[in-house]
Amino acid sequence: MATPTEKENSVSGADKLDDVKLEVQPGQNTDEAPLTTFTAEEERALVWKQDMAILPLSAAIYFLCYLDRSNIGNAKILNSSTKNDMQSETHTTSYQFTIALLVFLVAYAIFEVPSNILLKKLRPSRWIAFLMFSWGAITIGLGGTSTFPQITGVRFLLGMFEAGLFPGLVYYLTFWYKAEERSVRVAFILASATLAGAFGGALAYAIGHMNGVHGLSAWRWLFILEGLPSCLSAFAVWFLLPDFPEEWSRLSTRERDISHARLAIDGSKQHHSSMSWAEAKATLTDWRLYGHYAIYFGISTPFSSLSLFTPTITAGLGYFDLQAQLMTVPPYAVAYGESDTQPASTRMSRS
């Protein structure tokens, strides 16, 4: 007859109680490690501590990223009534302007995967801080462009340095959260993009009144003043963004053990073996990868178009000059409010 200890050690993952979780000791093989327990309350406290350190900072980073990539849409028509808008002063046609927008996405597609590789090798806090400072400086540089080739080249560089952020943040969350915990947190971060759209319109309206200050057109001030926060915030990210649970100084030894156990099955680790060719082939031949690709393509096409052309569309509806900038705020504000429905969808998917 099995002893209580033997029974406890034979408990499978399917038999876990809601208030008692199984824990694997750090450094041990998950198939052979002896099992210990931790309570649901301990786990909730750990997740809450992680949320407070990671989510607000990650959302703020993505907010600045999206603000800097989409503000060219505001600059295109800012002070167009006096011919001090970006398109008029750089003497670009509508077709050329569209090409300048397109090259951003080309660079974005090329550099996403390499950037994620570097994020793991160089540590998340260091790599993301570097990306932030770089895209902030490049955004400021857009304020100094005066020709179509210059705009196109700078936009390509912007796409190169922004490419790794969102997929990098999604990958970064796998170091800290179980699979079922990630969707609501990704949604929280992604929602900051719509908030950036609302703030972008309001900021463009305010900065539009700076036209001619120190001899610079308002659209140049727009790039300078919206790129600067990314550069400055990079220093905060360098020191404040935690890299991995096993190294975060704010976690106790007990909390690190719980974190290790939580992620033993479906989390990512700081150190792991390289992907084999067989694993790479299995991933690339999985139809679900391309299904997700098609879905995201369908979502991104209209979303990217709206983020870049909403000011132009609004102006075409008859709103005049700076008023067109202000009228881009309500749609994004409503969209941000609707993002609150994501937790409900997560609960429905579990039912």
Residue map of PLM features:
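Conserved MFS/SLC helix-loop-helix module at the cytosolic interface between two early adjacent transmembrane helices
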Residues: 109-151
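Residue-level signature of the transmembrane alpha-helical cores
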Residues: 61, 128-134, 138, 154, ...
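Extracytoplasmic
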Residues: 51-94, 110-111, 115, 164, ...
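Central mid-sequence intracellular linker of multi-pass
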Residues: 2, 42, 48, 179-194, ...
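Extracytoplasmic gate region of multi-pass secondary transporters
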Residues: 73, 278-344
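Central cavity-lining transmembrane alpha-helices of secondary-active solute carriers
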Residues: 101-117, 329-342
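Cytosolic juxtamembrane N-terminal segment immediately preceding the first transmembrane helix
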Residues: 2-80, 88
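Extracellular/lumenal inter-transmembrane loop segments of multi-pass membrane transporters
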Residues: 75-96, 120-122, 140-152, 160-163, ...
